[in-house]
Amino acid sequence: MLSRIKTFLKKEPVLGVAAICALVTVFFVLPDKEYLHYIDWRVLCLLFCLMAVVAGFQAVGFFRWLTELLLKVIRSGRALSVTLVMLPFFSAMAVTNDVALLIFVPFTLSLLDELDQRKAQIPMVVLQTVAANLGSMATPVGNPQNLFLYSAYDLGAGEFFAVTLPLTAVSLVALCAAALPVLPKALPKQEREAGASLAKGRLVIYALLFGLCLLTVLRIVPFVITTVVIVAAFLLLDRKLLGKVDYMLLLTFVCFFVVSENLGRIEAVRSFLQSLLEKNTLLTAVGASQVISNVPAAVLLSPFTDRWQDLLAGVNIGGLGTPIASLASLISLKLYMARPGARVGKFLLVFTAANLVGLALLLAFSMLI
């Protein structure tokens, strides 16, 4: 039994840690009917649907085709580096940070494999993760905490953008500078086939399913309908692709939902955070995000402060730091870990270093303005 647990923890360390943390919090908050409301089924279903569609894109050769197209347009390694980081940065503003990462991280890993630039995979995926988290703070729909605070404080567009756009602008400049050295100036010439094969019929279907996911992200189509349609479509087209979905990632999210919600119900934790808010709302929001993630931090702290500007900035800046500061970061980690020969220790080291630098930069900027 113990050997099985050790094997599982080696294979799924993130889920293992999340499950242990969830179990610990259960001793402080005994299971009751409130547990039924912990799980954000919309988020889980969207993640499932997007992972299935991305698997479909990979199966029909779409990423390989897109790689060839991109390399025809962009010849410089530095231009490609900046482009790969800016894609999730700007797309996250419209489709949220987790969706942007689910789209662009698999594509980037495939592209760097094609270019024989595997050493660049860790820094590039880390920068894409930071970019998606920081780009998403620009708009009310970019991430869940923005949407919640925008509604909770009944903010106007001008008020909101006055806080987020300066931070976004600084992030843009810093990310471009950080991206430049990731790939060599001149990309190595690769012998490529004269055009990747593309199953166009199925590609059209997967593209339509992807569009359905985006409509669900924008809350135009209910997530239940999208989930049913996508499951039915894959059962008819290629049911084996449903096995490509990372169900362990979904379970990891469930565990962290339990952790964050239970911490929010512990009176000692709530009282401690309230006392900190009175001293410094910005730093409290950043600190709380490191422990319980930025979305629960926004929900937990908002009733105790009217300093929404600092809270809004804090939970967005606080998405940098630990891997759970923004749960979207777990997506990148899991996608990278699924690669053959993944170096998880190095990934976490680079991830932590990049996040701490970004966190320090944006905190310093926030305190100056």
What is each model feature region?
Residues 161-172, 283-369:
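C-terminal transmembrane helix pair
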Residues 1-18, 76-77, 197-205:
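N-terminal membrane topogenic signal
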Residues 3-34, 46-61, 180-185, 212-240, ...:
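Structural signal for alpha-helical transmembrane segments and their membrane-water exit/capping regions
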Residues 86, 90-134, 148, 299-312, ...:
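Hydrophobic transmembrane alpha-helices that form the pore/transport pathway of multi-pass ion
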Residues 160-240, 348-361:
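Core mid-bundle transmembrane helix pairs that form the ion/substrate translocation pathway
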Residues 38, 60, 64-69, 209-306:
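Transmembrane helical segments that form the transport core of multi-pass membrane transport proteins
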Residues 41-43, 72-85, 114-125, 200-204, ...:
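Membrane-interfacial loop-to-helix junctions in multi-pass transporters
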Residues 55-61, 91-103, 135-143, 286-301, ...:
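Short helix-coil transition sites and intra-membrane helix breaks within transmembrane domains
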